[in-house]
């Protein structure tokens, strides 16, 4: 049951949030390209993006929730 729920969550995230993941990818790349200290390996980045997308999706893509998730992934982003 838990595995099925996880697969359903993953599918809805992938369907709904592919563009959001691209945006997060781009923002993180911009923030970390000149700062090796803040670079995350690809697997960590993907896990964080998936969590952020699930969180945003569950909150109906609310603008403030999106900003909060982006700041969580890349706290260097200026408002």
UniProtKB/Swiss-Prot annotation:
GO cellular component: host cell mitochondrion
Superkingdom per UniProt: Viruses
Parts of the chain that traverse the membrane: none
Subcellular location: Host cytoplasm; Host mitochondrion
Primary location recorded for the protein, binned into one broad class: host cell
Keywords: Host cytoplasm, Host mitochondrion
InterPro entries per record: Rotavirus_NSP6 (IPR006950)
Disulfide bond positions: none
Subunit and partners: Interacts with NSP2 and NSP5.
UniProt record similarity statement: Belongs to the rotavirus A NSP6 family.
Protein name in the entry: Non-structural protein 6
């Amino acid at each position: 049951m838990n595995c099925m729920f996880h697969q359903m969550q993953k599918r809805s995230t992938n369907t709904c949030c592919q563009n959001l993941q691209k945006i997060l990818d781009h923002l993180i790349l911009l923030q970390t390209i000149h700062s090796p200290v803040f670079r995350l390996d690809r697997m960590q980045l993907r896990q964080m993006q998936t969590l952020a997308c699930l969180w945003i999706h569950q909150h109906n893509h609310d603008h403030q929730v999106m900003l909060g998730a982006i700041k969580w992934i890349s706290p260097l982003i200026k408002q």
